[in-house]
UniProtKB/Swiss-Prot annotation:
Gene (name only): Foxp1
Lineage of the organism: Eukaryota, Metazoa, Chordata, Craniata, Vertebrata
Biased composition (Basic and acidic residues): 314-326
Described function: Transcriptional repressor. Can act with CTBP1 to synergistically repress transcription but CTPBP1 is not essential. Plays an important role in the specification and differentiation of lung epithelium. Acts cooperatively with FOXP4 to regulate lung secretory epithelial cell fate and regeneration by restricting the goblet cell lineage program; the function may involve regulation of AGR2. Essential transcriptional regulator of B-cell development. Involved in regulation of cardiac muscle cell proliferation. Involved in the columnar organization of spinal motor neurons.
Subcellular location, principal: nucleus
Region (CTBP1-binding): 410-414
Notes on the domains: The leucine-zipper is required for dimerization and transcriptional repression.
Keyword field: DNA-binding, Isopeptide bond, Metal-binding, Nucleus, Phosphoprotein, Repressor, Transcription, Transcription regulation, Ubl conjugation, Zinc, Zinc-finger
Protein name: Forkhead box protein P1
DNA-binding residues (ranges): 493-583
Annotated tissue distribution: Isoform 5 is specifically expressed in embryonic stem cells. Highest expression in the lung, brain, and spleen. Lower expression in heart, skeletal muscle, kidney, small intestine (isoform 3 not present) and liver.
Gene3D superfamilies: 1.20.5.340, Winged helix-like DNA-binding domain superfamily/Winged helix DNA-binding domain
Subunit structure as annotated in this protein's UniProt entry: Forms homodimers and heterodimers with FOXP2 and FOXP4. Dimerization is required for DNA-binding. Self-associates. Interacts with CTBP1. Interacts with NCOR2 and AR. Interacts with FOXP2. Interacts with TBR1. Interacts with AURKA; this interaction facilitates the phosphorylation of FOXP1, which suppresses the expression of FBXL7. Interacts with ZMYM2.
Amino acid sequence: MMQESGSETKSNGSAIQNGSSGGNHLLECGALRDTRSNGEAPAVDLGAADLAHVQQQQQQALQVARQLLLQQQQQQQQQQQQQQQQQQQQQQQQQQQQQQQQQQQQQVSGLKSPKRNDKQPALQVPVSVAMMTPQVITPQQMQQILQQQVLSPQQLQVLLQQQQALMLQQQLQEFYKKQQEQLQLQLLQQQHAGKQPKEQQVATQQLAFQQQLLQMQQLQQQHLLSLQRQGLLTIQPGQPALPLQPLAQGMIPTELQQLWKEVTSAHTAEETTSSNHSSLDLTSTCVSSSAPSKSSLIMNPHASTNGQLSVHTPKRESLSHEEHPHSHPLYGHGVCKWPGCEAVCDDFPAFLKHLNSEHALDDRSTAQCRVQMQVVQQLELQLAKDKERLQAMMTHLHVKSTEPKAAPQPLNLVSSVTLSKSASEASPQSLPHTPTTPTAPLTPVTQGPSVITTTSMHTVGPIRRRYSDKYNVPISSADIAQNQEFYKNAEVRPPFTYASLIRQAILESPEKQLTLNEIYNWFTRMFAYFRRNAATWKNAVRHNLSLHKCFVRVENVKGAVWTVDEVEFQKRRPQKISGNPSLIKNMQSSHAYCTPLNAALQASMAENSIPLYTTASMGNPTLGSLASAIREELNGAMEHTNSNESDSSPGRSPMQAVHPIHVKEEPLDPEEAEGPLSLVTTANHSPDFDHDRDYEDEPVNEDME
């Protein structure tokens, strides 16, 4: 039995060595196990060589099994890779099929397919046909299309839009041809006439202008047609025809012709004004300044953006002053004279760059323009009043000059307009320079210099307060409502008195009463100007509350609140200073006062080159009569004051004129306080407004709540 099992193992080992399968090896192992399970002792008769041989056979069998497993794994991996490649190829084929289907659909949508219904091709046919072969349809063809009823309403609308666009193109082409013919005729006429080189330059500029307009219109039409073809531009039933729509953004042919006429007339006006350099007519200078603005605007390559002509007014003004640097009202002596700017610019191009960058169209510049408009309106009103006053003074002095001791030459040689203009230019320091007041020499309009003044030179306190009240106009709810957003955003001092602002704050409250902190909050909420320098203006608010009789302090649950007594507020009307004997009594003597006034008047008239008051004509009897009339008026006022001194009321004692006038005694209101300032006083007056200017000479009374 042992020999048979050994022979079996040998035969099985040889079979494994010869490349037999792993199944035979398993059978061999099973046979060995069977022999061992029989209970016999197999290891007794086996030698060491047999055991080594058996071990080698087992190792060889394991190696063969491993090789088989590796081969199976490699085959599986190859199969997976092949499957992935097949899937990728299928996906690519599907994508190609989808693309082909899309192309076929696009081709089919462009053609009229009989298999589909009439609605689907009806929406696409006119657009594709118009893109391929745009042609104008005659009325007969349109009637045939309507009779056959082949097209749907949407398709008819698209077709009409395309036809209108084509008609517009034809109209533009005809207009362009006419314009080119006119240009050629004008060029031929100028060449035959043998005009100056300057006129030839103007003609070339005009030609370039026309070419640029044509290019702009063509680009605009192409853009609109592309939008229409893509379906982005449609026409509603209530809208006008298409030929007027694209030109509404730019210019219609009539506007182009009008602009062409303006350019030609402006250039001719420029030639006429250039020959008359000595003329000072304002209209001619305006025309000459507008002509280079248009030409430079057209020739500027940056003046057109996105095919549209930019006609912004500040740009035109800045370009118009490139050829006239000395005439720009916002530039002088190397400084930008925009209100509140005063930036130093080395030359005029630097100023233009600064003007376009710093003072562009934004909220801050708009707010400054609004404030400047208010300042100009107030100054115009003041100028009208001063002109009336000056006319009355001139009439009165003319009557005085007809007396026997006066000169035979009448005083009306100097017109009231000339005198008012020269007088206003004589004292530029009296112009109230707020942060938004222009610093350019634009003929500052001030209160006219008073020839017969009734203000004492020693009472500087009341004069300064009167000057401040003259500028601060009375407040009204309409003024705040109109400029509410402006005052909230712009750091501009409101042109109102503190008393008027406090009254407005109290009246706007629901209970018609406010605490001090609530008044502060109203100031900071309504005006951006009061959000800084709180200590200064809060001090002025406390002064006004404590010193005005119209503000009444009431104790309640909250503490101390302030209310307004309207009766007392309406009583705040100043009396004419000419009727106050206490103020007139404290004036200086007529000779001491008339000497500096006469000198200031002579200096102002001499600076303005008025023939009647020049240094050469100082010996004129008219000036002497004027001075004598001034002395007579002053002497009469002094005598009247001395005679009526005993009749003065206790509240108007002479002691009040020595000290600054208390507001409770004479609160001045801007509507009636029209007494003009003297030249000496206004020259010494600082133009900058202090926040507590109204009561700066009085003690501070702080209300602690």
